[in-house]
């Protein structure tokens, strides 16, 4: 698997590599899939998806962040692999997405409405704030699209006085859903 290069930064920062690995696993993208990301920021998730999915669309409302995505795609040899849209979701969301990643909490209710209406098969939303995690979980449930809630935290080891200690990242709440089949209520 190719390493993702992110030489261009955005103030919000990229989705961490370990978190991207779990996102990739939950999305299970194939060559036949149309993947859509809402809130591409640095393009870290978009880059990973462009290596797996047959078609990729990334939306970003901030022009400077979209340019960061564009530059990072180019740095990874994927400049022509992604359709970039400078838009605030749900505007300009395609109606034929197979998989959707929501990287931010802005307008997620409207984005989830769109996903439910268009039958998106795989939906993943990452949340870092507890209050938003609770509200977003309820939003998934209200639309009967929740399949799983995962909370995890990554810690990296560092040397301390000749031994190994750990520095923890903020926890991530990952909501996984589907508007086309098996949901939490079905299990």
Swiss-Prot record:
Enzyme Commission designation = 2.1.1.196
**Source taxon at top rank:** Archaea
Name the pathway: Cofactor biosynthesis; adenosylcobalamin biosynthesis; cob(II)yrinate a,c-diamide from sirohydrochlorin (anaerobic route): step 8/10
The protein's matches in InterPro entries, at most eight in alphabetical order, are given as: CbiT, Cbl_synth_MTase_CbiT, Cobalamin_biosynth_MTase, SAM-dependent_MTases_sf
The catalysed reaction is: Co-precorrin-6B + S-adenosyl-L-methionine = Co-precorrin-7 + S-adenosyl-L-homocysteine + CO2
Q: Name one GO biological process term.
A: anaerobic cobalamin biosynthetic process
Enzyme class label: transferase
Residues bound to S-adenosyl-L-methionine are: 15, 39-43, 60, 89
What UniProt keywords apply to this chain's record, in alphabetical order?
Cobalamin biosynthesis, Methyltransferase, S-adenosyl-L-methionine, Transferase
Instruction: Look up keyword Kinase and say if it applies.
Output: no
Q: Which GO terms describe its molecular function?
A: cobalt-precorrin-6B C5-methyltransferase activity; protein methyltransferase activity
Concerning its family, UniProt says:
Belongs to the methyltransferase superfamily. Archaeal-type CbiT family.
Record-linked NCBIfam families: CbiT
By what name is this protein known? Probable cobalt-precorrin-6B C(15)-methyltransferase (decarboxylating)
Q: Which gene encodes it?
A: cbiT
């Amino acid at each position: 698997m190719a390493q993702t290069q992110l030489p261009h930064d955005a103030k919000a920062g990229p989705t961490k590599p370990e978190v991207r690995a779990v996102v990739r696993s939950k999305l299970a993208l194939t060559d036949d899939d149309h993947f859509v990301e809402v809130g591409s920021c640095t393009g870290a998730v978009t880059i990973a998806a462009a290596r797996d999915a047959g078609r990729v669309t990334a939306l970003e409302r901030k022009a400077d962040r979209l340019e960061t995505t564009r530059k990072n795609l180019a740095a990874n040899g994927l400049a022509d692999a992604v359709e970039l849209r400078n838009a605030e979701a749900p505007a300009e969301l395609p109606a034929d997405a197979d998989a959707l990643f929501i990287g931010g909490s802005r307008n997620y209710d409207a984005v989830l409405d769109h996903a439910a209406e268009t039958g998106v098969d795989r939906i993943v939303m990452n949340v870092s704030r507890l209050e938003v995690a609770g509200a977003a979980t309820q939003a998934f449930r209200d639309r009967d699209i929740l399949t799983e809630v995962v909370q995890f935290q990554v810690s990296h080891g560092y040397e301390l006085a000749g031994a190994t200690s750990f520095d923890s990242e903020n926890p991530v709440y990952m909501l996984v859903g589907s508007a086309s089949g098996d949901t939490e209520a079905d299990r």
